[in-house]
Amino acid sequence: MKEFIGGKDVISRIMEAYGFANRRLLAEHLGMPHSTFGTWAKRGFFPAELVIRCVSETGARLDYVAYGNEPIFDNSDDLKYFHTIKLESGKSFIVENKPFLLPYLPNLDSRESYDKVFRIDEDNHTYFATSDYGNLVDGEYFVIVENSHLIRYITVLPAGKIRVDGGKFSFECELSDIDVVGKVILKMEKM
């Protein structure tokens, strides 16, 4: 039976699976104090719950995250790092690219189509959106309204109008009144 050895090594593997360069960024993503990692490393603690979460969110192999047995992912051809935007209070910030397995995304026309997909992190939601969405149809979109960057549900109305829902207030406007950046193709929520 393999032994779970905790501490610094397992934390480093978790950081690598998520694609973070330092513990502070990982802690921010996980919503925990970064000093926790220092305590775990010093005491040789094995963070089993975090290992399971990492495997679930990144698609990394359990054998790698828990024990360090390469490779990190089953099929590296299916792993892609996506440009990532963090939304906070209507403002957007570009953060480190984050990995995700392509089989978990909806099928697109071609593998090249995934180059137009980007990731959006907002509170406890993660969205994947594509800038190649063709004609506007009802659905969730990443939009800019009056310099606020938002995820909103758009309904197409007659006469070139749209209805924007999802905030405190819904409103109708011309499509040209807002900027549509991308259509959401996958939405995930952290429980």
Curated annotation (Swiss-Prot):
Task: Quote the InterPro entries the UniProt record gives.
Answer: Lambda_DNA-bd_dom_sf, Phage_CI_C, Phage_CI_N
Say which domain of life the source belongs to: Viruses
Q: Which UniProt keywords apply?
A: DNA-binding, Repressor, Transcription, Transcription regulation
Regarding protein family, the annotation reads: Belongs to the CI repressor protein family.
| Protein name (Swiss-Prot/TrEMBL) | Repressor protein CI
Q: Which GO terms describe its molecular function?
A: DNA binding
Q: Name one Pfam family in it.
A: Phage_CI_C
- Protein source organism: Haemophilus phage HP1 (strain HP1c1) (Bacteriophage HP1)
Functionally, this protein is described as follows: Repressor of lysogeny.
A GO BP entry: negative regulation of DNA-templated transcription
Q: Is Repressor a UniProt keyword of this protein? A: yes
